[in-house]
Amino acid sequence: MASTASLRVAPQADTYAAYQTPLAVRQACRSGALTGPTAGMAPGYVQGNLAVLPKELAEEFLRFCHFNPRPCPVIGMSEPGSFKVPVLGEDLDIRTDFPGYRVWQDGEVIADTADVTDYWRDDLVAFVIGCSLSFEEALMAEGLPLRHVDRNVRVPMFRTTVQCVPAGRFSGRMVMSMRPLVPAHAIRAIQITTRFPQVHGAPLHVGLPELIGVKDLMKPDYGDAVEVLDNELPVFWACGVTPQSVIAEAKPSFAITHAPGCMLVTDRRNTEFAIL
């Protein structure tokens, strides 16, 4: 799949100050005022990735997520045809409340859009999948710097050679997000993120990116490149963009996903998903 590193323009720093509550973020998406990444917005609240598939594939995809809980932890699911997921928020519309979407046909992206109302069908089932942006607040609270947040860009994401556990028509390579950290911070990040298994949990890989098929850290498959300094390690977490890699392999007749880095900000608090 071609790189999408330039798909979205990063917001200015004052954008983050404007969107401190989940509803404010969703309303900005709904109105078209927000079309960029959501990292750092509405601190303390869970963010989610999106995969929307026809009802005939929903059970199969749910089984795939069950087999692959690290990259695909389902935190909410709609009824067929419904664009509401009440467990994640009452004033919430799956069709409009992400800053950006991708529309897929037969495994190919046919549209990038800020609103999928015109594409919605009565047979569609929406899956909201936990996102690592949710645990970033906990990392920053411990003083761990996150370069993509500091620079107002999307976290870099890579299609690795790590294979997901297949389920029916769904199989493929796992996508991982990467954050550069000095060794002491990497150790602390492992300790912190272990508490959040429903938003990907602890890292799956640290250092030596070539062992998971990442040849160039400055050329992410999704998101934006950030440099890794000589005293830092690349730390990789399972990523909720994995369904997009899998959809490209499975080639369903129709699907909708979020644009990488452009998440749903829910009304659920990060602390609700912590286990320790």
Curated annotation (Swiss-Prot):
This is Putative hydro-lyase Xaut_1503. GO terms for molecular function: lyase activity. Keywords: Lyase. PANTHER family: D-GLUTAMATE CYCLASE, MITOCHONDRIAL. Gene3D superfamilies: PSTPO5379-like, PSTPO5379-like domain. The lineage of its organism: Bacteria, Pseudomonadati, Pseudomonadota, Alphaproteobacteria, Hyphomicrobiales. Its EC number is 4.2.1.-. It is an enzyme of class 4 (lyase). InterPro entries: D-Glu_cyclase, Putative_hydro-lyase, UPF0317. Belongs to the D-glutamate cyclase family.
